[in-house]
From Swiss-Prot:
GO terms for cellular component: cytosol. Belongs to the GPI family. This is Glucose-6-phosphate isomerase. The lineage of its organism: Bacteria, Pseudomonadati, Campylobacterota, Epsilonproteobacteria, Campylobacterales. PANTHER family: GLUCOSE-6-PHOSPHATE ISOMERASE (PTHR11469:SF1). GO terms for biological process: gluconeogenesis; glucose 6-phosphate metabolic process; glycolytic process. Its EC number is 5.3.1.9. Pathway: Carbohydrate biosynthesis; gluconeogenesis; Carbohydrate degradation; glycolysis; D-glyceraldehyde 3-phosphate and glycerone phosphate from D-glucose: step 2/4. It is an enzyme of class 5 (isomerase). GO terms for molecular function: carbohydrate derivative binding; glucose-6-phosphate isomerase activity; monosaccharide binding. It comes from the Bacteria. Gene3D superfamilies: 1.10.1390.10, Glucose-6-phosphate isomerase like protein, domain 1 (3.40.50.10490).
């Protein structure tokens, strides 16, 4: 456990020594701070100079990582050891994008051979849709792709297709359906033509309640309009491992793309779950996405901790969570194409590390994953940045931006990028009472009024942030960015001694929903309901009589 590691008391002592130190003083005294706390991996860079740390902090954090045998645990993941201990599974999402030819054997399966076989089928299918060779039941080309999934079968593909819209096929419109409330699927069905739509049903077991409910609604709608169930074969494909259920649905087994237990849902966009990505972007751009992630994998595996991007981000996060007692972390992308990135990272981070039981089954006496949240940075400045600047919470921020200007939007990117730098500087530097008072007096305010108002215009500063810069929003850079966060999450899971690759927390609610659904559908259940739940069930039934 973290609190039992030999470096932990050293970090506690160091925290007491520097907790009141202000970053603006460090910048003032150290002219090389920005260049020393800056790491670049090809066209992705991290400026971590605006953090409440110094060389001693980093040295101790690296010692902490060594206490946990982080290097050895990184290797264990890449080699296919069953580090997902509660489910007795390997964790090999890295194999999905590996360019290495050294085979990984897992329970007598050749992992890379299996992965590349599925990728080959995905490429052939993608080419047939994009080229117009794959036609619908009336011989129309496919114009709309509807991805039906939830969680990891939805968020990754949605985020990547949105982020890389400039690389998408101009004929294809992408639609993503995850919510079971009925509104989302019906809204999509109103917009599309059954004769030119391809549905991708993404569910490993092909039994996920939300996904199957939406898929069956889409199936019914399609059959009513096409007039024959046999046409399903041309318009529905599955990403699943349950061949029997897929065939019962009406999907040709040749249109089923498999993935494996060694790939968790939130790590699966690189697998057949990314079929919608490949169709939209094409195999060349999908390969670039994989290559960017592989580049980050190799960096994570081989770079020394001092210049290792995921290690640095992971350890800095631990520094705030477990020593400054920070409870929250903000993701602030300054690019409209990255608008879904915060909620993708929400799932990746909180479903992985939102746990309180150690690998040995013991209750952990320290905080683990913070609440991860975020929004488009420029919009957030006019919404919740007030709390970040002058509120009572310490909330570290990841600013994410690109250097590349958007075509046909002269002056826009300069305004956007100036705000990234200004906000990061403001969070670091702040504004003192004396500075605020001087500004007000310079504007001609009465001295007594200025003294009162100046208190409200103070910015304490010392708010930490990272700045992640991409040269441009490209497939390879998005691949590297996602892999960076995947590995950051892994680093923190190792430090906290938790299993980052199960998600038992999603199970209880699903179990309890079964008897409640029986009651709502008019059937009697033998389950016990607390008085509140029972009252709300009756309220629903009475309203819908």
């Amino acid at each position: 456990m973290l609190t039992q590691l030999k470096t932990y008391p050293k970090l506690l002592k160091h925290y007491e020594e520097i907790k009141e130190a202000h970053m603006r003083d460090w910048f003032s005294k150290d002219k090389e701070r920005a260049s020393r706390y800056f790491v670049q991996l090809e066209s992705l860079s991290l400026d971590y100079s605006k953090n409440r740390l110094n060389d001693t902090t980093l040295k101790l954090l690296f010692e902490l990582a060594n206490d946990c045998s982080l290097k050895e645990k990184i290797e264990a993941m890449f080699k296919g050891e069953k580090i997902n201990t509660t489910e007795k599974r390997a964790v090999l999402h890295t194999a999905l994008r590996s360019l290495n030819d050294t085979e990984i054997l897992l329970d007598n399966m050749e992992v890379l051979k299996s992965v590349r076989s599925v990728l080959k089928r995905m490429r052939a299918f993608s080419d047939s849709v994009r080229s117009g060779k794959r036609l619908g039941y009336t011989n129309q080309v496919i114009t709309d792709i509807v991805n039906i999934g939830i969680g990891g079968s939805d968020l990754g593909a949605l985020m990547v297709c949105t982020a890389l819209k400039r690389y998408g096929h101009p004929r294809l419109k992408m639609h993503f359906v995850s919510n079971v409330d009925g509104t989302q699927i019906l809204d999509v069905l109103e917009k599309i033509n059954p004769a030119s739509t391809l549905f991708i049903v993404a569910s490993k077991t092909f039994s996920t309640q939300e996904t199957l409910t939406n898929a069956l609604t889409a199936r019914k709608w399609f059959v009513e309009r096409s007039g024959d169930e046999k046409h399903i074969a041309k318009h529905f494909v599955a990403v699943s491992t349950n061949k029997e259920a897929v065939q019962q649905f009406g999907i040709d087994e040749h249109n089923m793309f498999e993935f494996w237990d060694f790939v968790g849902g939130r790590y699966s966009l690189w697998s057949a779950i990314g079929l919608s990505i490949m169709i939209y972007l094409g195999k060349k751009n999908f390969n670039a996405l994989l290559k960017g992630a592989y580049l980050m994998d190799e960096h994570f595996r081989n770079a020394p901790f001092e210049s290792n991007l995921p290690v640095l981000m992971g350890l800095i996060g631990v520094w705030y969570i477990n020593f400054f007692q920070s409870k929250s972390h903000l993701i602030a992308p300054y690019d409209q194409y990255l608008r879904h990135f915060p909620k993708f990272i929400q799932q990746l981070d909180m479903e992985s590390n939102g746990k309180r039981i150690s690998k040995k089954g013991e209750t952990i006496p320290y905080d683990t994953c913070p609440v991860v949240w975020g929004d488009m940075g420029i919009n957030a400045q006019h919404a919740f940045f007030q709390l970040l600047h002058q509120g009572t919470h310490l909330i570290p921020i990841d600013f994410i931006a690109s250097l590349d200007k958007k075509p046909n939007a002269k002056g826009h990117h300069e305004i956007l990028f100036s705000n990234v730098l200004a906000q990061a500087q403001a969070f670091m530097k702040g504004k003192s009472y004396e500075e605020a008072l001087g500004e007000l007096l310079f504007k001609g305010l009465d001295k007594d009024e200025a003294k009162d108002l100046a208190h409200h215009r103070v910015f304490f500063g010392n708010r930490p942030s990272n700045i992640l810069l991409l040269e441009k929003i490209s497939p390879s850079n998005i691949g590297a960015l996602v892999a960076l966060y995947e590995h950051k999450v892994f680093v923190q899971g190792v430090i906290w001694d938790i299993n980052s690759f199960d998600q038992w927390g999603v199970e209880l609610g699903k179990e309890l929903a079964v008897p409640i659904l029986q009651e709502l559908e008019g059937h009697k259940s033998n389950a016990y309901f607390d008085s509140s739940t029972k009252h709300l069930i009756e309220l629903y039934k009475n309203y819908n009589q």
